[in-house]
């Protein structure tokens, strides 16, 4: 199962995080499949930068975001786009 989660980088007392798609069995800082974005919690504005196309691609493939990543997606508006695209697929008529 593929999860979208945070991978800690940075120094002591100055964390930086990468948002990555990774196999759920891999350790926290292990090898990742795709880099989706990064997070700098020390900044007050623009702390999260995402590649929306890559993130939506992995979400559509069935990757499951952690609670923290889901809240970051909600703040950026990405989660709403994903839900809308998912609802369009379900309501579209089958031929």
Curated annotation (Swiss-Prot):
Domain of life of the organism encoding this protein: Bacteria
Biological process (GO) annotations held by this record are: translation
Q: Keywords, A to Z?
A: Ribonucleoprotein, Ribosomal protein
**Pfam family name, one:** Ribosomal_S16
- Keyword Ribonucleoprotein belongs to the record: yes
Q: Which organism is it from?
A: Mycoplasma genitalium (strain ATCC 33530 / DSM 19775 / NCTC 10195 / G37)
Gene ablation phenotype (knockout): Probably essential, it was not disrupted in a global transposon mutagenesis study.
Q: Which GO terms describe its molecular function?
A: structural constituent of ribosome
Name of the molecule in the record: Small ribosomal subunit protein bS16
Family of the protein in this entry: Belongs to the bacterial ribosomal protein bS16 family.
């Amino acid at each position: 199962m593929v999860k979208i989660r945070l991978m800690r980088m940075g120094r002591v007392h100055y964390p930086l995080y990468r948002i990555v798609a990774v196999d759920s069995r891999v350790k926290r800082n292990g090898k990742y499949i795709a880099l989706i974005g990064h997070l700098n919690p020390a900044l007050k504005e623009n702390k999260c930068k995402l590649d929306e196309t890559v993130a939506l691609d992995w979400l559509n493939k069935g990757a499951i975001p952690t609670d923290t990543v889901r809240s970051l997606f909600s703040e950026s508006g990405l989660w709403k786009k994903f839900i809308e695209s998912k609802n369009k697929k379900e309501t579209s008529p089958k031929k």
